[in-house]
Amino acid sequence: MGQKINPIGLRLGINRTWDSRWYAGKNEYGKLLHEDVKIREILHKELKQAAVARIVIERPHKKCRVTIHSARPGVVIGKKGADIDKLRKKVADITASDVVINIVEIRKPELDATLVAESIAQQLERRVAFRRAMKRAVQSAMRLGAEGIRINCSGRLGGAEIARMEWYREGRVPLHTLRADIDYGVATAFTTFGTCGVKVWIFKGEILEHDPMAQDKRMAEGDNSRPRRDAA
């Protein structure tokens, strides 16, 4: 049987780049990697309601720059920037270095695979019919300009005794085409019947130039996201 690998990992270095962008020698690499994991865990825990899709960590000399991609930047910033100051202190406690937090607003969350997957998972937890949740997400993505979308839901769907997998697809999702700009996201719904897994693939067109930063540039220049605020 053919298995589907993570389409983001397959395209790293082609039209997508890493979410942790720094270099370290073998003596420090493990320590910095653990710091990255802790930073992401804390931010996702603190920003559950902020619709965070992606956290990019860069480490210039003796600094740590964290870029949070969120559909609700106001929730991240808080009243008069109070919440973002708390986040900066928590991250600084982990890294023991100067921390800069940037926020990028995702203007079309319906085209972000991670946010779509989390939205469907939340609906499953609220006992919304899984077919309705999947169909609504597919229609929203296609209406806003996606060239294709596929959604998989697996588990005890609708409280069934036997777990199964259901999927919807509209348009085309060319997983083998390396120049394809495919976003991928996963989420888990914790229902009273057990856990249900949600996977989402969204095809946004092709990136013809060979540039690892191409996907980030497209997001910055296009309508999907825009810088909201730089917090020094």
From Swiss-Prot:
Stretches assigned to the KH type-2 domain: 39-107
Any GO molecular function: structural constituent of ribosome
Top-level taxon in the UniProt lineage: Bacteria
Disulfide feature: none
Keyword list, A-Z: Ribonucleoprotein, Ribosomal protein, RNA-binding, rRNA-binding
Pfam families listed in its UniProt record: KH_2, Ribosomal_S3_C
GO cellular component terms listed in the entry, alphabetical order: cytosolic small ribosomal subunit
Biological process terms in GO annotation: translation
SMART domains hit by this protein: KH
Segments passing through the bilayer: none
Family of this protein: Belongs to the universal ribosomal protein uS3 family.
Record-linked NCBIfam families: rpsC_bact
Subunit structure: Part of the 30S ribosomal subunit. Forms a tight complex with proteins S10 and S14.
Function: Binds the lower part of the 30S subunit head. Binds mRNA in the 70S ribosome, positioning it for translation.
Annotated protein name in UniProt: Small ribosomal subunit protein uS3
Organism: Rhodopseudomonas palustris (strain BisB18)
Gene that specifies this protein: rpsC
